[in-house]
Amino acid sequence: MSDVVGEVAREDSEGRGRYFIRLAPEAEAELTYRWSGEHVMTINHTYVPRAFEGRGIAGKLVDTVIADARSEGFKIRPFCSYVSAQFSRHPEWGDLLA
């Protein structure tokens, strides 16, 4: 299902951040978030360039967030429709919902 090029990286800045995959010199997929309190990540947007859609890239971003939430102990509030749909498909993630 996935022929993702590159690894997921994370950038944090004051109160917000993003997960991203560099797909080409000038193309990135990203999932953006902000912190709502100390232990709640509010995911507000997921983007994959049209030329790279259908390769499992957005799913890889979400899987990385889920792994980080489990290892770092934070909850997720999915405002992004894609991430919200993924939570509906994965009831085993329910314990991570804020």
Task: List each language-model region with its residue ranges.
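Intrinsic-disorder/low-complexity peptide segments enriched for small residues
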Residues: A29, G59, G94-D95
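N-terminal first-folded block
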Residues: S2-V40
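A short, internal acetyl-CoA/4′-phosphopantetheine-binding micro-motif in the GNAT/acyltransferase core
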Residues: T46-E53
